Design a protein with these regions (language model features):
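FIC/Doc superfamily catalytic core
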Residues: 1-230
C-alpha cells in the first residue's frame, strides 16, 4: 500500500538536488534584481502606483486559483486605503475582500514578525468573517477537527487522490512547521518558501482557505527575502 509523504519515517526531512535548483535560483535572483532596480528608479507617486497594482493583482490572482473572482476595483481601493495611497476612483469594499486584503498585507508588510498559531487563526478568521464558505458553515479561526480528502468523481464513484494528516495530529504537525518556519535561517529564501508552501498544503490545517493562506506564507517569505513589502 502506498504511503502518503507524512507517513514516512523521515517526514518532514526534505531533500533536494542542489545542482538542479541552484540554476533556477540564479534566474529568480536575476529577475528579482531587475524588478527591484526598476522600482527604485521610479518617483514616489509612480512607485506607490506600481506597488498598488502589484499587490492588487496578487490578491485577485490568488483568489482566482480557488475559483473565486474578486472585484478588482474593490481590492485596489481596500489596499490603497490601508496603505494610505491617495488615488482616484476609490470604491467601497465588501467585508470579505477587506478580510483577504488584511491577511495579505499583514503577511507582506509585517514580515519580520514571527508566524504563530494565533496569527494564522487571525488570517483564517479574516478570510471567512461570516463563518461560512459559500453556503457551508466551516470551522474558522482554528484548526480543522474533521478529516480532509482530495476527491474527484460522481457521488458513489468517488476517487480519493489524497488524504491529509489526521485531525488529531494537525496541532502537533503545525507546531513542528511553525518552529521550523521561525528558526530555520540557513536556507535560501526562495527554497524555504517552496518548502513552506508544500509542507503547509500537506498538513492542510484548515477546513477551507488553506491554499490562500499557503500563498500568503509564500508572499511573507518573499517580502522577507527582498526586504520589502512591495
Amino acid at each position: 500500500m502506498v504511503k502518503y509523504i507524512y507517513e514516512h519515517n523521515n517526514w518532514p526531512d526534505f531533500t533536494w538536488n542542489d545542482k538542479d535548483i541552484n540554476a533556477v535560483f540564479g534566474e529568480v535572483r536575476l529577475i528579482q534584481g531587475k524588478i527591484i532596480g526598476q522600482m527604485n528608479a521610479l518617483g514616489f507617486s509612480a512607485k506607490a502606483e506600481a506597488t498598488l497594482s502589484a499587490l492588487t493583482s496578487d490578491v485577485v490572482k490568488s483568489s482566482e486559483i480557488e475559483g473565486e473572482l474578486l472585484n478588482y476595483d474593490q481590492v485596489r481601493s481596500s489596499i490603497a486605503r490601508r496603505l494610505g495611497i491617495n488615488t482616484a476612483g476609490l470604491v467601497a469594499s465588501s467585508r470579505h475582500i477587506e478580510g483577504i486584503v488584511e491577511m495579505m498585507l499583514d503577511a507582506t508588510q509585517r514580515y519580520t514578525l514571527p508566524l504563530t498559531e494565533k496569527r494564522l487563526f487571525g488570517w483564517h478568521a479574516a478570510l471567512f468573517p461570516t463563518g461560512y464558505s459559500g453556503p457551508y458553515a466551516i470551522e474558522t479561526g482554528r484548526y480543522r477537527t474533521g478529516e480532509m480528502q482530495v476527491v474527484s468523481g460522481a457521488i458513489g464513484k468517488e476517487k480519493v487522490h489524497y488524504e491529509a494528516v489526521k485531525s488529531e495530529l494537525v496541532k502537533q504537525e503545525m507546531d513542528k512547521f511553525l518552529d521550523w518556519f521561525n528558526n530555520e535561517n540557513r536556507l535560501d529564501p526562495v527554497l524555504k518558501s517552496a518548502i513552506a508552501h508544500f509542507w503547509f498544503i500537506i498538513i492542510h490545517p484548515f477546513d477551507d482557505g488553506t491554499g490562500r493562506i499557503a500563498r500568503a506564507i509564500t508572499d511573507m517569505l518573499r517580502a522577507c527575502a527582498e526586504g520589502s513589502g512591495e
